[in-house]
């Protein structure tokens, strides 16, 4: 609480002090841009340069004010990719937040979030998402511009990482700005492609590429990365390796309805990574904040010296973990599961303990050694509040507690991709699903217990297993599901009735005003239409 008060008083100073740093290899004489040949020469003369550029890519994921800082705004929900995950989760039906002033992620109001202007608080969110992804893409292009793909030499692994991360960004963007990949959408406008080889004039007048064009590049980049990262040993889980590349391609294949390929890639990623799911016992305590856990394949590694941690409150732990007593969750801006989904979870499923019940109880709070965490949450408990996410340091309530890693890929997700891919390609997806849940979550589980077909059962498992981790919106779009909040009693009244049928234009995010003004290839007529709820 004291940190929140402190930051309100220094927010304007922080905004004035914010600067964006471009990598040295992008700067040429008199501020000009170096050519690809010049960058390649620089990299060969200074091998540390490519490593620095790679680090810059991953740093962009966790940069303070990355989305809005260049536009002159300093928002407490602008702390990198984890913030995007929270925004998109709030658009669905399972991730509930209170409708209060301290809730920086209360964007469950459909009409507000579809605002793309710079003159409203809600309109800033469209800019935040867009800018964050394209800044990461720009950092990736710093590598791809300077390396010959046909003859990358010692820069092969750097190139492959850049291509994989770029593909990740475009895959995320594609699921925000157009309906899912299908024969009906292939020629529909998606997002502008920014990549190596483009002239300044092409970038300044860059129209929306089609869905087909965007996914063609995603697939080409991931194919190259999957092959080129063979044998690469990364320094830590913050870097993309071959396992991550196969996992990303599994995600892309799932969206593209390449079911068998998705299952195959997911299985390959699991084999390469050696990652295994958390056990029932391990799931029985708060977590999902430590990249060293054996189920984690890729993560944003966050340490105490990172700017987002030094703020105390402008980080995902402050907004998500119920156990951090000096962040926004300590003033009731907590995250809950929808009561309807919670009630569907069996009492024998360890994941039911990831949220408080209607009596404010969870077996996770009684886990050995967690008495301090139980005390931390008691002042602001709400029914169905999450206790899934721990902090960076479960023994601390200070700065170390805010340094939680953000998990980008874990074994459980890949198993669910494998199950879905097999189920939709004639394989034994049900067997894979049953084995996972019975072994690692609920020994009493049966695939038929929710009365759903196998495809919807896998989606149900994803909704529970991956709750809060940034997958919900992509699943709603690719599976063409309605957003239905009617079966829950804990949605704030203002948002509870905001159900949306699949296929409506209101599901599409709108290209931000600043992009339309800066990009000669896009005008307001090219934007996704605004649709009233």
Over which residues does each language-model region extend?
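Flexible, polar/acidic helix-loop-strand segments at domain edges
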Residues: 345-409
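Short, surface-exposed recognition loops and adjoining beta-strand edges that mediate ligand/DNA contacts
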Residues: 31-41, 76-84, 177-187, 191, ...
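Membrane-proximal, proline-rich intrinsically disordered regions
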Residues: 21-86, 327, 332-335, 341-347, ...
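Conserved, well-structured interaction surfaces
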Residues: 101-177, 209-212, 226-232, 399-406, ...
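Sec-dependent bacterial lipoprotein signal peptides
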Residues: 1-19
